[in-house]
Amino acid sequence: MSSLSYCLLVTGPAYGTQQASSAYQFAQALITMGHKLNTVFFYREGVYNGNQLTSPASDEFDLVSAWQMMATEHRFSMHICIAAALRRGVIDAQQASELNLPVANLAEGFELSGLGTLAEAMLICDRVVQF
């Protein structure tokens, strides 16, 4: 079987549902099988995966850090829907400054983007999988 390129759409938070952890495990499997993961786009409640203030208990899996490490190692982009993020209090330094907010909390390796970024990713990937 030939290698395929994938885009993942994650709509569940890092904790509280299985959507994000299932997406992470799926991403691991894709990479292990030799496929290319191009983009992970976090939408709706999925934007919480990019919150650097998430602090799981010491005996819990740190999904935010896991996404960061995987993206760095395998060189794929992680986009956070800017509109969904702003509604849920996940912001980068630029947005914090523009909105006169005291702190930014977007984790390193994640980028605020519009839905156009998702549309572009869907056009270039062989497969799009939503979690």
UniProtKB/Swiss-Prot annotation:
It holds the Pfam family DsrE. Keywords: Cytoplasm, Transferase, tRNA processing. Heterohexamer, formed by a dimer of trimers. The hexameric TusBCD complex contains 2 copies each of TusB, TusC and TusD. The TusBCD complex interacts with TusE. Belongs to the DsrE/TusD family. NCBIfam families: PRK00207.1, sulf_tusD_dsrE. Part of a sulfur-relay system required for 2-thiolation of 5-methylaminomethyl-2-thiouridine (mnm(5)s(2)U) at tRNA wobble positions. Accepts sulfur from TusA and transfers it in turn to TusE. SUPFAM superfamilies: DsrEFH-like. It is found in: Cytoplasm. Its main location: cytoplasm. Its EC number is 2.8.1.-. The active site is at residue 81. This is Sulfurtransferase TusD. GO terms for cellular component: sulfurtransferase complex. GO terms for molecular function: sulfur carrier activity; sulfurtransferase activity. GO terms for biological process: tRNA wobble position uridine thiolation. InterPro entries: DsrEFH-like, Sulphur_relay_DsrE/F-like, Sulphur_relay_TusD/DsrE.
